[in-house]
Amino acid sequence: MSRKYFGTDGIRGRVGEFPITPDFVLKLGWAVGMAFRRQGNCRVLIGKDTRSSGYMFESAFEAGLSASGADTLLLGPMPTPGIAYLTRTFHAEAGVVISASHNPHDDNGIKFFSGQGTKLPDDVELMIEELLDAPMTVVESARLGKVSRINDAAGRYIEFCKSSVPTSTDFNGLKVVLDCANGATYKIAPNVFRELGAEVTVLAASPNGLNINDKCGSTHLDGLQAAVIEHHADLGIAFDGDGDRVMMVDHTGAIVDGDELLFLIARDMQESGRLQGGVVGTLMSNLGLELALQDLHIPFVRAKVGDRYVMAELLARNWMLGGENSGHIVCCQNTTTGDAIIAALQVLMALKRRGQTLAEARQGIRKCPQVLINVRFKGESDPLEHPSVKEASARVTEQMGGRGRVLLRKSGTEPLVRVMVEGDEEATVRAHAEQLAKIVSEVCA
């Protein structure tokens, strides 16, 4: 059944434009409270990133929960995976994240976790949508939900992150640059790595409500690359605004993306006897990852794009590790969703066990040339269903002769068509991608 409000990862949009408005978020809080109160008493955790609009939407959502009779626990600024973890440990019925992830400050969104710290099942999302279209009612005064704040939320999550590596772990002598994207990891990540012994230089850790992801973080790596070289660091780690994506930079300033990080963790887990089953990637995962894992006899399957689909595939197969090239990495032995800090720690442990630099360790995977072009579109029609787009995609696929892949898909979080072409010769791949993007752009116009 199609959804009216929910995308692939909650509800997201421009602040002040429907549905990211205070009145809608108030109604959403009420609908969530009503949905979960059907199971009895209800407590909901709310966390957010550092956007200035987060305070407005936190208050609105909290008011809606109270009107439904649900209690609220406020976490303040907290990485998305931290909210998932605390939802589990506090035995809450649900967790709420107010964030637009890697998007700029003038976007925001609401996404949810179940009491188990996983993304909401489809039937619960559909129930919330039905309630959103129903008249809002308020419980009697004596049954209004209560609100309290968890003051030690950051400390709890810091200790949880540290517990994901052996207690004997000591990164003494390791020089690391962290880019916190002026987002939700700005206090937590530096403390985690320093408490584990690393020498840490921190970038983009002064949020002002407007500078989240602004020329920093996992989608803007120039500053991190320069800082790693300037400080003669061993590596750099970049998080996105809500702390569920991670990218790295080696000591030469070369970018190490999610596919490569996933390979490093998988190889280490195999070598240490901790890998259960295989690895789940997505339709966007580089062919080089699949081939590198194949060389290690590690099974690999592709899920739809989105960490919720990666997680669903992991659960269905009872596997432990999956991720996306964007840096969402799920380590099921530790987490129930993509966790940037914990994924980075697993990579550092892999390097430590092998006695290698990041530049040396990444040589185990040879990525195939891949070009991704985003084309913005407006309107309700699906540009991917247009005959000229279908014909062009089929033509390029035929021209590549089985030596590459073509993938056209709509983003689940932004009004974009993603045009991806992958093959064994970069110039050819780029030419094909630009040709397809031009046709998609003409259709969208």
Curated annotation (Swiss-Prot):
Per its record, the protein catalyses: alpha-D-glucosamine 1-phosphate = D-glucosamine 6-phosphate
Q: Could you tell me which species this protein originates from?
A: Pseudomonas paraeruginosa (strain DSM 24068 / PA7)
Query: What's the Enzyme Commission number for this chain?
Result: 5.4.2.10
Summarize the PTM comment. Answer: Activated by phosphorylation.
Family as reported in the entry's similarity comment:
Belongs to the phosphohexose mutase family.
PROSITE patterns, per database record: PGM_PMM
Task: Tell me the classification of the organism that encodes this protein.
Answer: Bacteria, Pseudomonadati, Pseudomonadota, Gammaproteobacteria, Pseudomonadales
Name of this chain's protein: Phosphoglucosamine mutase
Locate the Phosphoserine modifications and list their residues: S101
Its encoding gene is what?
glmM
What does the record give as the function of this protein?
Catalyzes the conversion of glucosamine-6-phosphate to glucosamine-1-phosphate.
What is the free-text note on the cofactor? Binds 1 Mg(2+) ion per subunit.
